[in-house]
Design a protein with these regions (language model features):
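Alpha-helix N-cap and loop-to-helix initiation/capping positions
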Residues: 201-209, 244-251
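Catalytic His-Asp segment of secreted/periplasmic serine-dependent ester chemistry enzymes
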Residues: 171-172, 233-298
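Conserved SGNH/GDSL esterase-like catalytic core that processes O-acyl groups on lipids
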Residues: 1-101, 105-208
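Hydrophobic/aromatic beta-strand patches that form the interior of the parallel beta-sheet core
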Residues: 155, 227, 266-268
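Conserved, well-ordered alpha-helix/loop/beta-strand core segments that scaffold catalytic motifs
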Residues: 186-192, 207-219, 223-234, 254
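Active-site donor-binding loop signature of nucleotide-sugar glycosyltransferases
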Residues: 111, 159, 231, 270-272
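Structured segments of extracytoplasmic/periplasmic soluble domains
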Residues: 3-11, 147, 177-181, 190, ...
Length: 298
């Protein structure tokens, strides 16, 4: 994001879900929230697929629920302020929201019910923004954003534990409504670390499911190019206790290459870009370390 925004303009962290289990580990934005019931497609219970937004989540507020984003400048540049802040929701009843920019005065918004995705935008030099729900019966919230008015916007939809197949279940009308409000030029798919197994050879079902997911995205984002990234290297120990590339990884990469070819989208081999066989161990043991000691995550 930093490299692209320096080259082509733009600022801000982009789309952020209302709540996040990993907000404390995200260095690109300071994210605080309270008063929400959170639902994700990776939940084992109480998730209604028909309600989910573009990120595979939906959030139900209690009166007084809030979410705040604050820019930062310690991790990367161009993230300390933005020019436009937005919040995305869908209400079947009237909704009262208040917003506070840069710890200033509250500004109140009252919106009526709608059949589709709703958005409130605030413009200015925004270093922090706090949205508070004063009343929101029958309202689902999806996320908020900090963007520039021109240049690059990069939205990172991280969903821990997802194989990518859950993309098939996001309602097409919801994706199309998001596309009208945030039209993407490029969609990058990076999945598979949770799919690869030690001896996995047959990923036919995964291939079939991901092909369906890609066609779903093509239908809902017809203007967007799509790029599939392969899994990177993932190391495990053999019977002698020596680290080596997990055999199932290379099999999965062949399947991913076939998926890209069959669906007519671009493909980039991250395994080869990392250095190929055994490259994860080299990254882990580098000084300073460039990957996690699970020998899985960069």
């Amino acid at each position: 994001r930093e490299m692209l925004q320096k080259q082509f303009g733009g600022c801000g962290v982009g789309f952020v879900t209302i709540t996040s289990m990993t907000s404390g580990y995200r260095p690109t934005v300071r994210h605080t929230f309270g008063g929400w019931s959170s639902h994700a497609v990776t939940d084992s219970v109480y998730f209604d697929k028909k309600k989910q937004g573009i990120s595979g989540h939906y959030f139900v507020p209690r009166n007084g629920a809030y979410v705040e984003l604050r820019g930062q400048n310690k991790y990367a540049s161009l993230l300390d302020t933005c020019q436009r802040a937005s919040i995305f929701f869908h209400s079947r009843d009237s909704v009262l929201l208040s917003v506070r920019v840069n710890k200033g005065e509250n500004k109140n918004y009252s919106l009526g019910p709608s059949d589709g995705l709703q958005q409130i935008q605030v413009d200015g030099r925004i270093g922090s923004i706090r949205w508070t729900v004063d009343r929101a019966d029958s309202t689902l919230f999806y996320g908020l954003a900090m963007d520039g008015k021109k240049g690059i916007i990069l939205d990172n939809f991280s969903l821990r534990g997802s194989s990518g197949l859950s993309l098939r279940g996001i309602p097409p009308q919801m994706l199309k409504q998001f596309n009208r409000q945030r039209p993407y030029d490029l969609i990058i798919l990076e999945y598979g670390l949770n799919v690869a197994t030690e001896r996995g050879r047959n990923y036919d079902n995964y291939q079939k499911g991901l092909l369906t997911a890609i066609e779903h995205l093509k239908e809902c984002f017809p203007q967007a190019g799509i790029l599939l990234l392969s899994v990177g290297d993932r190391d495990s120990k053999n019977e002698n206790g020596e680290l080596r590339t997990m055999p199932g990884v290379k099999n999965l990469i062949r399947y991913q290459q076939n998926i890209a070819a069959e669906s007519g989208i671009a493909f980039w081999n991250m395994f080869e870009a990392m250095g190929g066989e055994g490259s994860m161990a080299k990254l882990v043991h580098a000084k300073p370390s460039m990957a996690n000691y699970d020998y899985t995550h960069i």
